[in-house]
Curated annotation (Swiss-Prot):
Active site: 760 (charge relay system), 837 (charge relay system), 870 (charge relay system)
Regions of compositional bias (Polar residues) in chain numbering: 44-55
Name of the molecule in the record: Probable dipeptidyl-aminopeptidase B
Compositional bias per record (Low complexity), positions renumbered to this chain: 27-38, 127-136
Membrane topology: Single-pass type II membrane protein
Organism: Arthroderma otae (strain ATCC MYA-4605 / CBS 113480) (Microsporum canis)
InterPro entries referenced in this protein's UniProt entry, alphabetically: AB_hydrolase_fold, Peptidase_S9_cat, Peptidase_S9B_N, Serine_Prot_S9B/DPPIV
Any one Pfam family match given in the protein's UniProt record, by short name: Peptidase_S9
Gene: DAPB
Amino acid sequence: MGANSRVNDDEAMPLTGHGAGSRDSIDSSSTASISLTLVDGASHTATEPSKSTNGHKSHTEGSYVNEKYHDSEEESWREDGYVPSGGKPAQRRTRIVFWLLVALCVGGWAMAFIIMATSPNNRHSTSDSSSGGSESEIVKPNTPHDGKKIPLDDVLGGMWGPVEHTISWISGPKGEDGLLLQKSEGGIGPYLHIEDVRNIHGMRANNNSIVLMKESVFFVNDERISPEKVWPSPDLKTVLAMTREKKNWRHSFTGLYWLFDVETQTAQPLDPEAPNGRVQLASWSPTSDAVVFTRDNNIYIRNLTSKAVKPITTDGGANLFYGIPDWVYEEEVFEGNSATWWSLDGKYISFLRTNETMVPEFPIDFYLSRPPGYTPEPGEEAYPYVQQIKYPKAGAPNPTVNLQFYDVEREESFSVNVDNNLKDDDRIIAEVIPASGGKMLVRETNRESYIVKVTVIDAAKREGKMVRSDNVDEIDGGWVEPSHSTTYIPSDPSAGRPHDGYIDTIIHEGYNHLAYFTPVENPKPMMLTTGNWEVVDAPSGVDLKNNVVYFVATKESPIDRHVYSVKLDGSELQMLNDSEKSAYYDVSFSNGAGYMLLKYQGPNIPWQKLISSPSNEDFYDEIIEENKNLARLSNEFSLPSLHYSTITVDGFKLPVVERRPPNFNETKKYPVLFHLYGGPGSQTVNKKFTVNFQTYVASNLGYLVVTVDGRGTGFNGRKFRCIVRRNLGYYEAHDQIQTAKEWGKKPYVDKTRIAIWGWSYGGFMTLKTLEQDAGETFQYGMAVAPVTDWRFYDSVYTERYMHMPQHNTEGYENASISNATSLSQNTRFLIMHGSADDNVHFQNTLTLLDKLDIMGMHNYDVHVFPDSNHGIYFHHAYKMVHQRLSDWLVNAFNGEWVRLRNPKPSGLKRVIRRLLHFG
């Protein structure tokens, strides 16, 4: 569930909470762990993309072999050695057997017909009453109805992922705007270089072109070094390069670091005394003269004028982290691997001290795999490898965090105490924003995320004060949504800004809007946006020369995204992209906001172009990606049509999208698969172009697929979102059930064949919906990596929406999947989970299975993927999990699970054996 990340239609996403929604899946181009959106090979960035860019490599795991599926009954006959016709021995006996078989088959067929005709579970009649929904838009594919069906392997393999170019914007040494960091592939041109955005193809000479690394390899003491990640210094004279990367958690990694001199094209270890020491994090000073880094959980500093490395801390260890987050802060708070911040003048370093001594450990067992370099002790080869994770579950002790400071010139560490009434065990440091003059803006929340406090700390004076305090519980009963987009605005009297300030997203009249606080100590802001719509991860960019703020918002529709600009005084709000069409845009701005990478992401074929901002007098407009191959595919294959509408439940308008199969015929009866995620603040119904598992189900299997974003999801206002506070699962499930009831009234829907499925939070919602519905509307469900008890999930995420279990015992009981009697009313359901899931622990599924065992239930199937984490990838498991979903769903809608509800032994085999024996 991690913190804020752009998420859309997400299957294997981790639980995520707010902002733009959930994390990536096989179709999402957002921020996540398991995206199959393709990044063009020629555009892989040499540095980590900035917060306003999205780009994720395909997570395919090689090729897959089509497996043969055998009918078990057919195989058993072969084992009996029965020959259906002919054969020399015992022809008379064979004829007797033949006629007995005929009689038995006819009788069996007749009996089966009577049973099926009288069974309510097999009546496929539906009500002809109309739905309560209102249809608003249909997105039809370009493909002919007789086009090819989309194979599942093509979807999982990334064939349908749009090519997305990620751009690493970089400022020039003199503040030049519109520069890109580029890495050449295939040995063509210099390996690492800076180009002007107007010369992105390198076709003409440009004064802003700078070669940083001529070759893709360099040598240190005869050792051949091939950099995997690079970070140029702000003055572009040195490159920090990393090799031998080892992945840690979702965002964190370690590696060996090197300093590469641009002028001499030579390199040296970051720490000459420990060249093989694995570094967890490293970052440049704004003045380019030093690098601060964390190794073995301690912080060090290396000044470029010396080869000496100086320790800033020395007591870091297994339970004490400096400058990097622990697991829960990485996953749920920062969404990244850094907890170190330089002051803008480079004179001070602030860093987080994280103490997780009191945090309980959770074991993750690996039965088949081992960490790189790990060798079991002799005699222990047959035992699982157990990884212990400090994982604070809901109500358990959290890590305690404190913000520390280091004076670079004086070489001394210190802390600044600010009394804001948050105790150490009730504090989450959510965001740190460097400001001018050695100042830092610090956003803190209480543990249950309903109190937010903003503090200004002056490192030079070693003092600080609280400048803002809000109690969201008193505003709307909701929660504070984590932010990573707060933007500092320096003072500039010549530009009309006499004081410094910052832009933040706040709650205004029930919606998330942009506010400008100036001076920074002012608790009352100037509103930059207002209305019944919301800003998204805003601001995207700020033009300080012209006092213009750029942002993405849902002003036209909750399921649309458009790019807007507004003046710092709140005037001249305008849309920058095509205002006449419903669409989904994203944007990435250059550091000075003079240029932008505009990304059209749907509903039609995505494209990208580089353009100058409206405030930039130097006009520029160039398309860099049209996804022609994707357009070609969409003309060859039959894609479903998308029908967008809203349905009103309890006075709330819920966005819905229905995928109809090619050659849809309203006179036929179609089974329906509901797909959902449903996590707080997430969004699954939107106008992005996606070809995913849902597309495959509609296109290849010919089923209807419906997705509804119920209450609790994002971008429909705080009232819509925060109603789920303290009671996760209830309203969300209610909305799925009511929507399914309305869909069951449609003349083309077979209401006796309705299923629901989801992954992660969607897995929880699948089970909660089945539990609440008790077989009345949904007959089938498929839950992947589900939460079944919120006491098992991490504290930061869970308590944000549920409070601590100690303060909401009844809510936790209600939110757990515990009513086995209700689940027994469904025809059948499927649960799948990875045994090494470090996010939603396998404990969730095992606990539910125990409850089902106690009740003697048997209307479910379980598939466990050994050593797979939350994404379920190990040993081609990602292919398997989707193939199992597909096969299981086909069997469900073919009535196979109805047949298995009351299995009876077949006497046919015994009769034949006896006849063969005595004949």
